[in-house]
């Protein structure tokens, strides 16, 4: 799924201890989602989401986000990424599936 510049993204972490927050993506700068994740807009249509501890999350289709082990590329977890509302740009909600 293409995420436009200045889009608002809601990330719901797996643990309840981390509060979900909104973040704005712009200028290809990394944006801290929580202590573990950062959003990095790429030059392509997709936005790459990187995990600090040797795990990467990235878009591989228009509707799904994959949490992947970078060493063997095994899919660890799949997320459903859906457009939800429009508010100052496109608003997306990341659901754990």
From Swiss-Prot:
Subcellular location(s) of the protein: Host cytoplasm; Virion
The entry's keywords: Host cytoplasm, Late protein, Virion
GO cellular component: host cell cytoplasm; virion component
Chief location of this protein within or outside the cell: host cell
InterPro entries to which the protein is assigned, alphabetical: A15
Domain of life: Viruses
Entry similarity comment: Belongs to the chordopoxvirinae A15 family.
Function: Late protein which is a part of a large complex required for early virion morphogenesis. This complex participates in the formation of virosomes and the incorporation of virosomal contents into nascent immature virions. A15 is required for the stability and kinase activity of F10.
Subunit (UniProt): Part of a complex composed of A30, G7, F10 kinase, A15, D2, D3, and J1.
Protein name per UniProt: Core protein A15 homolog
Species the sequence originates in: Fowlpox virus (strain NVSL)
């Amino acid at each position: 799924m293409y995420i436009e510049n200045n889009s608002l993204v809601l990330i719901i972490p797996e643990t309840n201890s981390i509060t979900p927050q909104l973040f704005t993506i712009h200028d290809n700068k990394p944006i801290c989602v929580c202590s573990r994740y950062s959003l990095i807009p790429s030059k392509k249509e997709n936005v790459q989401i990187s995990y600090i501890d040797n795990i990467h999350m990235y878009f591989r289709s228009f509707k799904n986000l994959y949490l992947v082990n970078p060493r063997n590329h095994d899919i660890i977890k799949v997320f459903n990424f859906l457009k939800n509302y429009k508010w100052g740009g496109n608003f997306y909600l990341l659901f754990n599936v």
